[in-house]
């Protein structure tokens, strides 16, 4: 994407979102969220940080809705190839590391999962994003065909079915295909939300956005407290995860507020804007490196976030350092990967794939009248 078409505020949000994803994984996958006694001040502070960071994945997807919703034409096969190649590289890299470390046995099944990561759901986000990207021409046709009233109705129905119904009746998530937000169907809703904001030039004052983000996050923490009591009392396994899912209404409100807040931000310094534009495209690699199914448990066992027994101040200091280090290493590794990608002249292959796909589609569908 050319720099002049990129939004410095949104690209800053892309970087921040990835750091927040690492933070969220540290509290969840890394075990810090369960290190302190349940109900203690430290316990709830960790989960408040988790909820504040929960918007990150939604915002990351919404960026695609903003950038891609005005694109015309068929899906770009070259871009699909780029996504697939990057996921495959990190899948094989982390698989080799895991096998070498003894964390994963070398078997036909594990090798097949590594070789076909988008089909094995080794990276749930990558699989869902790939399917969403494949659907972009259809999603854009919907975006461009609806008037404002119809569009509002679409969003209202989608949120009622997926956010409200999918949370209150969490045991029925398979019927709504939302799976607590771990689904390409939920990504469609996020895409439509961001596309709506762009199509109708929705703007909200920054102060109000910040207030809505903090208020919705506070509501998310309260809902988690309540859901934890209900889950423990009634043995409703999975209720807490549904209440704090990506699709939960408070998470959606906080995500929209964060998105609209960064829409108002424009970096004026050429120096910092160049750095943001350099780092932001590497963010996806940070996720692929640190959250592979093959090495996730190994990584967080090595980091050992609960080493201080959940004690608040040392744990927060250690968490901050660990999150920043993981993010920095991830950005550095992906910078190397992107250079290797260019050295192998794979961007030229993307162009050829786009041209080939266009010819095939023209032969199948025919040209416009």
Region locations from a protein language model:
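Solvent-exposed interhelical
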Residues: 134-160, 196-215
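Transmembrane alpha-helical segments and their boundary/interface "anchor" motifs
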Residues: 43-44, 50-61, 68-99, 103-132, ...
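Interfacial loop-to-helix transition and helix-capping segments at the boundaries
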Residues: 45-57, 113-128, 169-190, 222-256, ...
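Aromatic-anchored segments of alpha-helical transmembrane domains
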Residues: 19-26, 90-97, 156-170, 213-229, ...
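Alpha-helical transmembrane segments of multi-pass integral membrane proteins
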Residues: 96, 229-343
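Structural signal for the C-terminal ends of transmembrane alpha-helices
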Residues: 66-74, 138-146, 193-203, 260-269, ...
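Juxtamembrane "helix-exit" motif on the non-cytosolic side of transmembrane helices
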Residues: 31-35, 99-106, 165-174, 222-238, ...
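Loop-centered beta-sheet repeat module
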Residues: 151-202
């Amino acid at each position: 994407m050319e720099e002049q078409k990129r939004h410095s505020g949104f690209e800053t949000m892309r970087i921040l979102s990835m750091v927040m994803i690492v933070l969220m994984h540290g509290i969840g996958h890394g075990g810090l969220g369960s290190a302190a006694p349940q109900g203690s001040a430290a316990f709830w502070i960790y989960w408040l940080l988790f909820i504040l960071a929960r918007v990150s994945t939604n915002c990351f997807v919404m960026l695609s809705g903003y950038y891609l919703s005005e694109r015309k034409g068929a899906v770009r096969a070259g871009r699909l190839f780029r996504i697939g190649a990057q996921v495959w590289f990190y899948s094989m890299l982390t698989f080799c590391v895991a096998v070498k470390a003894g964390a994963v046995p070398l078997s036909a099944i594990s090798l097949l999962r590594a070789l076909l990561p988008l089909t094995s759901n080794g990276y749930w986000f990558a699989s869902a994003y790939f399917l969403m990207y494949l659907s972009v021409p259809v999603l854009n046709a919907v975006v461009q065909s609806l008037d404002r009233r119809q569009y509002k109705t679409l969003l209202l129905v989608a949120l009622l079915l997926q956010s409200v119904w999918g949370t209150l009746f969490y045991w029925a998530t398979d019927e709504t295909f939302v799976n607590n937000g771990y689904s390409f169907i939920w990504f469609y809703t996020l895409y439509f939300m961001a596309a709506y904001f762009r199509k109708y030039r929705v703007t909200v004052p920054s102060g109000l956005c910040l207030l809505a983000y903090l208020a919705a996050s506070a509501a998310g923490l309260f809902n988690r407290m309540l859901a934890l009591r209900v889950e423990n009392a009634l043995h409703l396994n999975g209720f807490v995860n549904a209440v704090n899912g990506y699709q939960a209404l408070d998470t959606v409100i906080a995500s929209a507020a964060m998105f609209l807040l960064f829409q108002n931000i424009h970096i004026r310094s050429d120096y910092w804007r160049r750095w943001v534009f350099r780092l932001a495209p590497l963010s996806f690699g940070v996720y692929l490196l640190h959250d592979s199914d093959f090495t996730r448990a190994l990584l967080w066992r090595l980091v050992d976030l609960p080493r201080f027994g959940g004690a608040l101040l040392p744990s927060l200091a250690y968490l901050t350092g660990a999150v920043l280090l993981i993010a920095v290493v991830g950005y550095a590794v992906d910078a190397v990967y992107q250079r290797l990608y260019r050295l192998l002249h794979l961007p030229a292959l993307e162009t050829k794939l786009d041209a080939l796909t266009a010819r095939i589609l023209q032969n199948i569908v025919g040209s416009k009248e």
